[in-house]
């Protein structure tokens, strides 16, 4: 694995081509991550199900805003999606100027922070959605998914995009680190 | 900000000193992260509270294993802690050989994965502990912390170490990336 450390100057054109490839892959992964976080936020944000007779005295309408963890999920996915859109110009700049150093460092640190944010959001939402599906006998929390069938399906589905974005952000950090190491 | 890109060869001794400083800081942060994840896992894992008459027919004993999210918290913090201990020799090697490239790349990708793991664990546990404290009126989940006072305090407290480790791992990724960029 250490063979790449010798003769770096003689392989400059090849290295540059690979760096450009890495930068293009970075851009593609970023676009996919934008789509998946945006889809997650929209899918969760637009979920609602009205149950006319859930309790005898109120009309029950289930929305994401009823559960704080799902609200956090929508907000966090929107933030990550906005950040990823803002990072696209920088990613395009890296294709043109593949030796950039400080801008890649900036991307790595923000990508890591956004990785933490999107992971926190998807895992808090997962904990709550899991509870909605299964309930918890010891804590006496009942599963609410028998009543709220389509609500539970939509919320479960919208987790997928967020977990996808998590994996993509780990890959993006790896790509940026590889680009830094290749210089 | 781009001024560092010129005259890199002439500043080699200074750069090496800074790189060594970065590597030492990396080691210190790793040790702190080991302690905080280990403390979190132990604090959560040893929590239990017995309520003799919570319900009239069973003796209620609250443990972390009653809630899947808290079990995940203990497991994930143990894994991250074990990984961080295993990464210490590599971190020490970086102090001696500050120009290392591939081993830093390996550390960055594993640090990013462990960041995702510890964030997922702490945020899922936070969602459940928050629910235990506040309950949720819409889903008809009652707050269980009135009865389980010391259980709730211990579990809330053990979240701190995990969130600390999250911040430390973001800093570790930044330090590794900086070391790669400085080479």
UniProtKB/Swiss-Prot annotation, chains A, B:
Domain of life: Eukaryota
Entry GO CC: plasma membrane
UniProtKB keywords: Cell membrane, Cell wall biogenesis/degradation, Glycoprotein, Membrane, Transmembrane, Transmembrane helix
Ranges of the Extracellular topological domain: 45-71, 126-158
Keyword Methyltransferase in record: no
InterPro entries membership: CASP/CASPL, CASP_dom, CASPL
Subcellular location: Cell membrane
Topological category with respect to the lipid bilayer: Multi-pass membrane protein
Residue spans crossing the bilayer: 24-44, 72-92, 105-125, 159-179
Glycosylated residues (UniProt): 48
Positions on the Cytoplasmic side per record topology: 1-23, 93-104, 180-183
Keyword Repeat listed: no
Any one of the GO BP annotations: cell wall organization
Protein family per UniProt: Belongs to the Casparian strip membrane proteins (CASP) family.
Role description: Regulates membrane-cell wall junctions and localized cell wall deposition. Required for establishment of the Casparian strip membrane domain (CSD) and the subsequent formation of Casparian strips, a cell wall modification of the root endodermis that determines an apoplastic barrier between the intraorganismal apoplasm and the extraorganismal apoplasm and prevents lateral diffusion.
Subunit record text: Homodimer and heterodimers.
Name listed for the protein in its UniProt record: Casparian strip membrane protein 2
Upper taxonomic lineage: Eukaryota, Viridiplantae, Streptophyta, Embryophyta, Tracheophyta
């Amino acid at each position: 694995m250490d063979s790449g450390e010798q003769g770096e100057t003689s392989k400059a054109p090849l290295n540059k081509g690979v760096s450009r490839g890495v930068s293009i892959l970075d851009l593609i992964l970023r676009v996919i991550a934008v789509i998946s976080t945006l889809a997650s936020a929209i899918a969760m944000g637009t979920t609602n199900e009205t149950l006319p007779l859930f309790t005898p005295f109120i009309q029950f309408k289930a929305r994401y805003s009823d559960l704080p963890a799902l609200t956090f999920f929508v907000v966090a996915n929107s933030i990550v999606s906005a950040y990823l859109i803002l990072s696209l110009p920088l990613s395009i700049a890296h294709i043109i100027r593949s030796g950039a150093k400080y801008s890649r460092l900036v991307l790595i640190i923000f990508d890591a922070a956004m990785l933490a944010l999107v992971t926190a959001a998807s895992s808090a939402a997962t904990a709550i959605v899991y509870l909605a599906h299964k309930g918890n006998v010891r804590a006496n929390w009942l599963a609410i998914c028998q009543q709220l069938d389509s609500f539970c399906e939509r919320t479960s589905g919208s987790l997928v995009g967020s977990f996808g974005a998590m994996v993509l952000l780990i890959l993006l950090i790896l790509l940026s680190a590889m680009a830094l190491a290749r210089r």
